Amino acid sequence: MKIAVIGYSASGKSTLAARLGEMTGCPVLFLDKVQFLPGWQERDRAEARGMVEDFLNENRERGWVIDGNYANFHQERRMAEADLIFFMDFPRRICLPQALYRNWKYKGRARESIAEGCDEKMDLEFLLWILRDGRSRERRQQFRDLMERHPRKVVVLKRRRDVRHCLELLDRIAAENQNRDRTGKITGNEELR
Protein backbone atom coordinates (compact mmCIF):
# COMPACT_ATOMS: atom_id res chain seq x y z
CA MET A 1 0.00 0.00 0.00
CA LYS A 2 1.20 3.52 -0.79
CA ILE A 3 -0.06 6.27 1.50
CA ALA A 4 0.59 10.01 1.39
CA VAL A 5 -0.11 12.10 4.50
CA ILE A 6 -0.47 15.81 3.79
CA GLY A 7 -1.97 18.78 5.58
CA TYR A 8 -1.34 21.68 7.88
CA SER A 9 1.64 22.07 10.19
CA ALA A 10 1.19 20.54 13.65
CA SER A 11 -1.93 18.67 12.56
CA GLY A 12 -0.41 15.29 13.42
CA LYS A 13 0.85 14.22 9.99
CA SER A 14 4.05 12.63 11.29
CA THR A 15 2.26 10.80 14.09
CA LEU A 16 -0.30 9.39 11.67
CA ALA A 17 2.39 8.46 9.14
CA ALA A 18 4.40 6.59 11.78
CA ARG A 19 1.28 4.70 12.90
CA LEU A 20 0.38 3.82 9.31
CA GLY A 21 3.92 2.57 8.75
CA GLU A 22 3.58 0.28 11.77
CA MET A 23 0.21 -0.99 10.60
CA THR A 24 1.21 -1.68 7.00
CA GLY A 25 4.83 -2.67 7.50
CA CYS A 26 5.77 -0.13 4.83
CA PRO A 27 8.79 2.16 5.18
CA VAL A 28 8.01 5.74 6.19
CA LEU A 29 9.67 8.81 4.69
CA PHE A 30 9.36 12.04 6.68
CA LEU A 31 9.92 14.85 4.19
CA ASP A 32 11.11 17.18 6.96
CA LYS A 33 14.08 14.81 7.33
CA VAL A 34 14.75 15.23 3.63
CA GLN A 35 14.36 19.03 3.67
CA PHE A 36 16.58 19.79 6.66
CA LEU A 37 20.16 19.12 7.63
CA PRO A 38 21.39 19.51 11.24
CA GLY A 39 20.88 22.98 12.63
CA TRP A 40 17.80 23.57 10.47
CA GLN A 41 19.93 24.12 7.37
CA GLU A 42 18.05 23.43 4.15
CA ARG A 43 19.34 20.59 2.01
CA ASP A 44 20.19 21.31 -1.63
CA ARG A 45 16.92 20.98 -3.56
CA ALA A 46 18.35 18.68 -6.26
CA GLU A 47 19.78 16.37 -3.60
CA ALA A 48 16.46 16.36 -1.71
CA ARG A 49 14.50 15.58 -4.87
CA GLY A 50 16.93 12.76 -5.63
CA MET A 51 16.42 11.28 -2.16
CA VAL A 52 12.64 11.27 -2.62
CA GLU A 53 12.92 9.82 -6.12
CA ASP A 54 15.22 7.05 -4.85
CA PHE A 55 12.77 6.24 -2.04
CA LEU A 56 9.84 6.06 -4.47
CA ASN A 57 11.77 3.84 -6.89
CA GLU A 58 13.17 1.53 -4.21
CA ASN A 59 9.74 0.97 -2.65
CA ARG A 60 7.65 0.82 -5.80
CA GLU A 61 6.61 -2.79 -5.18
CA ARG A 62 6.80 -2.85 -1.39
CA GLY A 63 4.73 0.26 -0.77
CA TRP A 64 5.43 3.31 1.35
CA VAL A 65 4.09 5.98 3.67
CA ILE A 66 5.24 9.55 3.00
CA ASP A 67 4.63 12.39 5.45
CA GLY A 68 4.68 15.96 4.21
CA ASN A 69 3.59 18.43 1.57
CA TYR A 70 6.70 19.82 -0.21
CA ALA A 71 5.42 20.46 -3.73
CA ASN A 72 8.99 20.46 -5.06
CA PHE A 73 9.67 16.91 -3.88
CA HIS A 74 7.82 15.01 -6.62
CA GLN A 75 4.46 15.86 -5.09
CA GLU A 76 2.43 15.05 -8.19
CA ARG A 77 4.18 11.71 -8.63
CA ARG A 78 3.62 10.88 -4.95
CA MET A 79 -0.07 11.71 -5.21
CA ALA A 80 -0.48 9.82 -8.50
CA GLU A 81 1.19 6.69 -7.10
CA ALA A 82 -0.54 6.81 -3.71
CA ASP A 83 -3.38 4.39 -3.05
CA LEU A 84 -4.63 6.70 -0.29
CA ILE A 85 -4.03 10.35 0.50
CA PHE A 86 -4.83 11.48 4.03
CA PHE A 87 -5.39 15.24 4.23
CA MET A 88 -5.01 16.50 7.81
CA ASP A 89 -7.39 19.48 7.64
CA PHE A 90 -7.29 20.36 11.33
CA PRO A 91 -8.27 23.89 12.41
CA ARG A 92 -5.82 26.34 13.94
CA ARG A 93 -7.43 25.87 17.37
CA ILE A 94 -6.17 22.27 17.35
CA CYS A 95 -2.86 22.76 15.52
CA LEU A 96 -1.57 25.56 17.74
CA PRO A 97 -1.97 23.65 21.04
CA GLN A 98 -0.48 20.55 19.38
CA ALA A 99 2.53 22.61 18.27
CA LEU A 100 2.95 24.03 21.78
CA TYR A 101 2.73 20.53 23.29
CA ARG A 102 5.23 19.18 20.77
CA ASN A 103 7.60 22.03 21.60
CA TRP A 104 7.33 21.21 25.31
CA LYS A 105 7.70 17.45 24.75
CA TYR A 106 10.77 17.68 22.52
CA LYS A 107 12.34 20.85 23.93
CA GLY A 108 16.07 20.82 23.21
CA ARG A 109 16.06 17.68 21.08
CA ALA A 110 14.93 16.51 17.66
CA ARG A 111 11.75 14.53 17.24
CA GLU A 112 11.72 11.31 15.21
CA SER A 113 10.33 12.97 12.10
CA ILE A 114 13.05 15.59 11.71
CA ALA A 115 16.78 15.44 11.03
CA GLU A 116 19.17 14.94 13.94
CA GLY A 117 20.47 18.27 15.14
CA CYS A 118 17.18 20.05 14.41
CA ASP A 119 16.12 20.63 17.98
CA GLU A 120 12.47 21.45 18.48
CA LYS A 121 11.85 25.17 18.49
CA MET A 122 8.95 27.54 18.67
CA ASP A 123 9.58 30.96 17.21
CA LEU A 124 7.46 33.75 15.80
CA GLU A 125 8.01 32.58 12.23
CA PHE A 126 6.63 29.11 13.01
CA LEU A 127 3.70 30.52 14.99
CA LEU A 128 2.80 32.73 12.05
CA TRP A 129 3.13 29.74 9.73
CA ILE A 130 0.62 27.75 11.81
CA LEU A 131 -1.80 30.62 12.28
CA ARG A 132 -1.58 32.52 9.00
CA ASP A 133 1.07 31.88 6.36
CA GLY A 134 0.62 28.11 6.12
CA ARG A 135 -3.09 28.66 5.50
CA SER A 136 -2.89 31.40 2.92
CA ARG A 137 -5.48 31.52 0.15
CA GLU A 138 -2.84 30.12 -2.22
CA ARG A 139 -1.96 27.19 0.07
CA ARG A 140 -5.62 26.32 0.64
CA GLN A 141 -6.17 26.41 -3.12
CA GLN A 142 -3.21 24.06 -3.64
CA PHE A 143 -4.84 21.53 -1.31
CA ARG A 144 -8.22 21.93 -3.07
CA ASP A 145 -6.58 21.45 -6.48
CA LEU A 146 -4.81 18.33 -5.27
CA MET A 147 -8.07 16.88 -3.93
CA GLU A 148 -9.82 17.65 -7.22
CA ARG A 149 -7.11 15.82 -9.18
CA HIS A 150 -7.32 12.72 -6.94
CA PRO A 151 -10.88 12.67 -5.56
CA ARG A 152 -11.20 8.91 -5.10
CA LYS A 153 -7.99 8.65 -3.07
CA VAL A 154 -8.38 11.51 -0.60
CA VAL A 155 -9.59 10.97 2.95
CA VAL A 156 -10.09 14.30 4.75
CA LEU A 157 -9.47 14.18 8.50
CA LYS A 158 -10.71 17.27 10.37
CA ARG A 159 -10.32 16.20 14.00
CA ARG A 160 -8.72 13.57 16.20
CA ARG A 161 -11.91 11.52 16.22
CA ASP A 162 -11.66 11.17 12.42
CA VAL A 163 -8.09 9.89 12.78
CA ARG A 164 -9.11 7.37 15.47
CA HIS A 165 -12.02 6.14 13.37
CA CYS A 166 -9.81 5.78 10.30
CA LEU A 167 -7.14 3.84 12.21
CA GLU A 168 -9.78 1.55 13.74
CA LEU A 169 -11.16 0.86 10.28
CA LEU A 170 -7.70 0.09 8.92
CA ASP A 171 -7.06 -2.20 11.90
CA ARG A 172 -10.28 -4.09 11.14
CA ILE A 173 -9.42 -4.39 7.47
CA ALA A 174 -5.92 -5.61 8.31
CA ALA A 175 -7.29 -8.16 10.78
CA GLU A 176 -9.77 -9.46 8.21
CA ASN A 177 -7.11 -9.60 5.52
CA GLN A 178 -4.06 -10.92 7.32
CA ASN A 179 -2.85 -12.46 4.11
CA ARG A 180 -1.17 -9.61 2.31
CA ASP A 181 -0.28 -9.97 -1.32
CA ARG A 182 3.35 -10.01 -2.38
CA THR A 183 3.47 -6.21 -2.74
CA GLY A 184 2.52 -5.67 0.91
CA LYS A 185 -0.82 -4.09 0.07
CA ILE A 186 -3.70 -4.42 2.47
CA THR A 187 -6.68 -5.60 0.46
CA GLY A 188 -10.18 -4.34 1.04
CA ASN A 189 -9.33 -0.65 1.34
CA GLU A 190 -12.32 0.24 -0.78
CA GLU A 191 -14.24 0.62 2.51
CA LEU A 192 -12.28 3.85 3.07
CA ARG A 193 -13.58 5.53 -0.04
For each feature predicted by the language model, list its residue ranges.
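Walker A (P-loop) ATP-phosphate-binding motif of ABC ATPase nucleotide-binding domains
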Residues: 2
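Hydrophobic anchor at the beta1->P-loop junction of P-loop NTPases
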Residues: 5
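The conserved Walker
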Residues: 9
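Conserved lysine of the Walker
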Residues: 13
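Conserved substrate/cofactor phosphate-moiety recognition/catalytic segment
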Residues: 18, 22-62
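NTP-dependent small-molecule kinase module
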Residues: 23, 131-193
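Glycine-rich phosphate-binding loop used to anchor ATP phosphates in small-molecule kinases
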Residues: 51-96
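A glycine- and Lys/Arg-enriched "phosphate-lid" helix/loop adjacent to the NTP-binding pocket
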Residues: 90-138
